[in-house]
Amino acid sequence: MFKKHLEDLRPEFPNVVGLILDQLYVDDLLGGADDTEAALAIANTAKDMFAQIKMKLHKWLSNCPDVLKCFQEPQHEPATNILKQVVSTDAGAKALGVRWDTKSDVVCFDPSYLIEAAKQKPTGHTKRDMLRLSSRIFDPLGLISPIVLEMRMLHQQLWAKGVQWDGAAPPELEAAWQKITDDLHHVHNVRVPRWIGTSTSSTPVELHIFCDASEKAYGAVVYGRIRNVDGHFTVNLLCSKTRVTPMPEKRPTLPRLELLSCELAARLVKTITTATKIEWQVTCWSDSKVALGWIRRNPQRWKQFVRNRVFLITNITCSSWWRHVPGLENPADLCSRGASAGKLIPAAIW
């Protein structure tokens, strides 16, 4: 109903209606502006449009105190300095751990609920226990994907050993799981800037995607590199994606896994450019000269597996965007091998 109402108002408020429809998720609206005046104009217009159909926008939240002051009225619910992603469960609303600290304007994590869940059963974990805990990690952007990947690789080992759902994990896997959960408190230190530095005056806007693969997993990680008007560059982690490789009997060769990581990188390019609507200068990096050779040549030369993936990669990206990076300088190495929280947080390359 409200979408039909907004479409009717599009001729009168084209910019605001477009922003709302583009950034509305169920009943949560996430938007922004370059300055306080523009933010207030968007917020007030949105409030008035929804008021026409008796829908009140509330729970206003902003990293700008001046914007919040304009909505600190009795009819509005008081804003807090943290926006938590929650879901409804039998026990009530539970924080999934990802939050936005508006005072410092960073995306951060609260692993306390994971730590408490791990303490409830310190030893004798079953496959069900491990999967239950790891599935509670809510990291849609993949900011801590190497940590989650390490858990998933351990799950695969449990499957390979034929461990039943309620069967105890072998001692070596139990010890590995214990080390992972013991390091979860380090996730408190993950703080990623919400604003990546883009503005109407920032140029150029670079997107760098790194990809890598190992026999256990493959993945890609994306960074934004922005040059401000003062000539300084700002580099921020945007997102990442990891995947565990198939079981050994169905596992492709390592060069083909490297090509799969390039495909994953290309898909991330499409996702980010579509979502941000920014004219990025894209550069894709891989440490596999074989995969780069496949991408840079005519796909018709290769067999079906390689040909299909090269077609997809070159349909999304240009072959000239792809460059080689030494393996030791590739941050996506963490996406292909996994890392505990204790190793990921201090890793400068991430």
Predicted regions and their residues:
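Short, conserved micro-motifs composed of acidic
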Residues: 61-88, 328-332, 337-349
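Conserved pre-motif C helix in the palm subdomain of viral-like polymerases
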Residues: 1-13, 103, 128-152, 251-262, ...
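Catalytic palm subdomain of template-directed nucleic-acid polymerases
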Residues: 18-56, 66-74, 290-303
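C-terminal reverse transcriptase regions that engage the nucleic-acid substrate
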Residues: 87-201, 206
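A short, polar/acidic, helix/strand-boundary loop motif
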Residues: 1, 226-260, 297
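Active-site palm subdomain of RNA-directed nucleic acid polymerases
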Residues: 1-41, 45, 267-283
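RNase H catalytic domain
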Residues: 23, 69, 264-331
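Acidic, metal-ligating active-site segments
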Residues: 205, 209-237
